[in-house]
Amino acid sequence: MGKRVEELRKQNAGLKWDEYKKELKRFSDAIDSDFKTAFRGMLDAIEEQVPHLIDKGLNLKKRAFPVRKLILAGDDVCFVTEGRIGLEAARIFIEKLSALENTVDHKKYTACAGVAIVHQKYPFYKAYELSEMLCSNAKRFLASFNDDKISEAGTKGCAIDWHIEFGEIIDDLSDMRRKYETADGGT
């Protein structure tokens, strides 16, 4: 998002400070609105699937929705789900978001996500740190593409990195991945 803000600044270099602040506010408000729209779309999609999830044996409480919003401010999003739907919820959110276009710079959104699948009693702050590491890893993955891999939308796409944590608290993602490395070097 930083590159887009920088482009907006360059495009509006001739504006007075107060006018530029208004344009930046419109841009920020559009981002906030679009991310909330995508999140609502994800919730609606999950809600449609709840009866099917219950039929497949997912033990969902009748009055407890399986997604909880923790942070939804601008382009910062953090939510908690029932573990078995975490990846799908992230995929749906990113799909809904990438279909939207910002009304100020007229560009589509790209996003990366880190999905940490942990036990219910796993320390939340460690799960959050893990999801941040995973998201950073997904961003590095996208950054590794050459510019010739940029899509028609002018982006390199979206990415999700995920990890199922089995209870050991390890501070480094590469150490975690090394621990679960297969004989052929994959993880």
Per-region residue spans from a language model:
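Charged, helix-rich terminal subdomains or tails
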Residues: M1-T187
